[in-house]
Amino acid sequence: MFIATSCSNGSSSKDYQEESDFSQTASGKNDSNGFVYIKGGTVSKRVGKEGCPFYNASETPVTIESFYIAETETTYKKWLEVYEWATSDERGEEKYTLNKGYQGNYEDKNYGTPLMPVTFLSWRDAIVWCNAASEMDKLEPVYLISKTDNTPVRQAETSTVTSGFGKAENAYVDKSANGYRLPTEAEWEYAARGGNPYIESWNYDYSGINNIEELVDYAVCIVSNLKNKLTNTAEVKSKKPNYAGLYDMSGNVWEWCYDEYSSTERIFRGGGWIYPANFCTVDYRGYADNLKNSSDDAVKIIDLDQVYGKSSAVGFRVVRNANK
């Protein structure tokens, strides 16, 4: 099941124009591997409505540790490279099991391009792929069987099981590991807003722009589809980046976050190519029931697989801890 809820900005930009050590932040520094450094800090002004990560920041400041985030959504090219390595029979007992995904919004690989974001993958698939990518790059996997068993979770199950050690949704999260992982919802929104609460773009409606007339230059969504006659996902980096140098934080595909919305639902953010502009703001929250079946057709995302939360409009991008 897919639902989206608004967390619109509840603060004026002047609340953030004060002196701080965020001035001309280092956020936005790109490395050779396609990751952008996001300088951590403390958000102490309310932004967004109830339910958003920084809603209670005025009463309870929220501290974000520095982290690295991929400058683009995970492409099908990168997904497939890791998938083929991870699912090879040569890996024996350490072989991974996960969904192969779509090339953009196309199941048929004769359409689209490998530089479109991978789609049609569940939250479980994303978690397991992160572990596979970490192992392939000789990094420390983040999602483990348990606190006492450091075996990486390698199975993205296609059952409705929601309990038991070693399941993707019940993995032990090694917060000290240096491998790839999904961003928390707070990390995602912090980066989407530009990685600095004291810059003007922190309060923009969209990632990188505040003017819907210019949104076509920053986001792949219904507004840009109508203007550019697009009928599908776009290659990453087709639009302009936000203040931090991140592409497609608004539009193209929704991006899985690690956080739970409920015990059976996980959050994704950013909006997608088949959605109107108001779904692609930095404060819209989507969530999907990827762990159990649902018969509520009224809120069903277009072509969403109700059991596994998969859609041609949902993908992800990865982050890594900094200073690890």
Where are the predicted features?
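Active-site microenvironments of metalloenzymes and redox enzymes
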Residues: E50-G51, T63-I209, S262, R320-K324
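Active-site-proximal beta-strands of protease catalytic cores
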Residues: G251-D259
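Disulfide-stabilized, aromatic/cysteine-rich ligand-recognition loop
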Residues: K240-N242, Y261-K324
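Bacterial Sec-dependent N-terminal signal peptides
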Residues: F2-G34
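Chymotrypsin/trypsin-fold serine protease catalytic domain
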Residues: P197-A234, E265-G270
